[in-house]
């Protein structure tokens, strides 16, 4: 029986490349001359810390980072940025988290969405991924299109497609 897995992962090497590219772009920008700023990627906690001298500049740096992530194939919705920007001394910073895995509430929404579609497929939650099996390859492709089209707040990848 054909099957595939629905996962939500961010390639940390590509994220590191995007952070380096964003840092390189900011170095050459006139509006960031003589401004203290930094991008720090923490592999262990999967966070990106953006630091600058004002909250407006932090928002500009986040926009640059999102653009560079998108160029490297990482969707902007995989970056979870908190609303409040922290002020500490003369610097402002925000610690954005990269979404890895699918939360259980989102998993349940996806499984319910698949079951409500009345397609002849089964969906099973396995850890932080969802395995979808069915008799028809067309049904599985319909599920892929439905998950891509559903507004669930994070990007999904499809792996291990087997016939």
Swiss-Prot record:
A single GO molecular-function term is: nucleotide binding
- Matching InterPro entries, A to Z? DUF520, UPF0234-like_C, UPF0234_N, YajQ-like_sf
The GO cellular component terms are: cytosol
Keyword annotations for this protein, in alphabetical order, are: Nucleotide-binding
Concerning PANTHER family, the annotation shows: UPF0234 PROTEIN YAJQ
- State its role: Nucleotide-binding protein.
Task: Describe the family membership recorded for this protein in Swiss-Prot or TrEMBL.
Answer: Belongs to the YajQ family.
Protein name, UniProt field = Nucleotide-binding protein YajQ
What organism is listed for this UniProt entry? Shigella flexneri
What gene is it encoded by?
Answer: yajQ
């Amino acid at each position: 029986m054909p099957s595939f897995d629905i996962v939500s992962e961010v390639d940390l090497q590509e994220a590191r490349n995007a952070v380096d590219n964003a840092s390189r772009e900011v170095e050459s920008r006139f509006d960031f001359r003589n401004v203290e700023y930094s991008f720090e990627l923490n592999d262990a906690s999967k966070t990106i810390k953006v630091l600058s001298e004002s909250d407006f500049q932090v928002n500009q740096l986040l926009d640059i980072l999102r653009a560079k992530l998108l160029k490297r194939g990482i969707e902007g919705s995989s970056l979870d940025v908190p609303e409040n920007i922290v002020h500490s001394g003369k610097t402002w910073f925000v610690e954005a988290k990269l979404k890895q895995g699918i939360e259980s509430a989102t998993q349940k929404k996806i499984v319910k969405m698949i079951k409500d579609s009345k397609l002849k497929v089964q969906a099973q939650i396995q850890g932080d991924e969802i395995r979808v099996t069915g008799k028809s390859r067309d049904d599985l492709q319909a599920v892929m299109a439905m998950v891509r089209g559903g507004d669930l707040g994070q990007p999904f990848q499809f792996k291990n497609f087997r016939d």
